[in-house]
Amino acid sequence: MTAIRVPRRRASADLQGGFDFSRPDEIVCGVDEAGRGPLAGPVVAAAVILDPARPIDGLDDSKALSAKKRDALYDLIVARASAFCVASASVDEIDTLNILHATMLAMKRAVEGLSVLPTLAQIDGNRCPTLTVRAEAIVSGDALVPSISAASILAKVTRDRMLVDLHERFPVYGFNMHVGYSTPQHLAALREHGPCEVHRRSFAPVREALDLMAGSR
């Protein structure tokens, strides 16, 4: 695994698709995750191989985009990518493995689920999962490499939609508003109602809410 730190700028035109034209035999997939920090729900990862013949304008780090723009780009990525896969690691896996290892597992599942076998996986961040293909970590890759940007959008939109669905089952927590992050509203609901089955018990605020509920009995 290699880790690359590059200046924060957009990738060149030669890197706009899933093929690196300076290395014409490469099939490159971008990989990113969503949901490492929240107190509830799975961590989701996506892998994307872009089609250089079907470019997508406006790709960027999902966190820099509005929800409306993310949704529009999500549809374009799904329609135009050469291949993509979205995968996750469950709350139980997060609590058993820890969030870092669960994130690596979700990324591995996403890459292995691609219908096209890449020769290189470019991972956002400074760590790579263990893969059967070559991998390199790119710091701030979600803002620099279009295929990683695309992966960040698929992962973020997918996870946000999962949490909106979970809101229907557990409405007292407001998952539709904060998608599991530790907002004041979420923390107050945790203290009042205690955790539900989709809360990550390995995370300190959830453990504290459990202790509070146990102490009040």
UniProtKB/Swiss-Prot annotation:
Gene Ontology CC terms: cytoplasm; ribonuclease H2 complex
Record localization: Cytoplasm
A Pfam match: RNase_HII
Record has Nucleus as a keyword: no
CDD domains noted in UniProt: RNase_HII_bacteria_HII_like
EC nos: 3.1.26.4
Protein residues bound to a divalent metal cation: D32, E33, D124
Co-factor binding comment: Manganese or magnesium. Binds 1 divalent metal ion per monomer in the absence of substrate. May bind a second metal ion after substrate binding.
Highest taxon of source: Bacteria
GO biological process: DNA replication, removal of RNA primer; mismatch repair
Enzymatic reactions: Endonucleolytic cleavage to 5'-phosphomonoester
Keyword Metal-binding appears in the UniProt entry: yes
Domain RNase H type-2: residue ranges: 26-215
Keywords for this protein: Cytoplasm, Endonuclease, Hydrolase, Manganese, Metal-binding, Nuclease
Cofactor: Mn(2+); Mg(2+)
GO molecular function: manganese ion binding; RNA binding; RNA-DNA hybrid ribonuclease activity
Family: Belongs to the RNase HII family.
Functional description taken from the UniProt entry: Endonuclease that specifically degrades the RNA of RNA-DNA hybrids.
Classification via PANTHER family: RIBONUCLEASE H2 SUBUNIT A (PTHR10954), RIBONUCLEASE HII (PTHR10954:SF18)
Protein name (Swiss-Prot/TrEMBL): Ribonuclease HII
Species per Swiss-Prot/TrEMBL record: Burkholderia ambifaria (strain ATCC BAA-244 / DSM 16087 / CCUG 44356 / LMG 19182 / AMMD) (Burkholderia cepacia (strain AMMD))
Lineage: Bacteria, Pseudomonadati, Pseudomonadota, Betaproteobacteria, Burkholderiales
Gene: rnhB
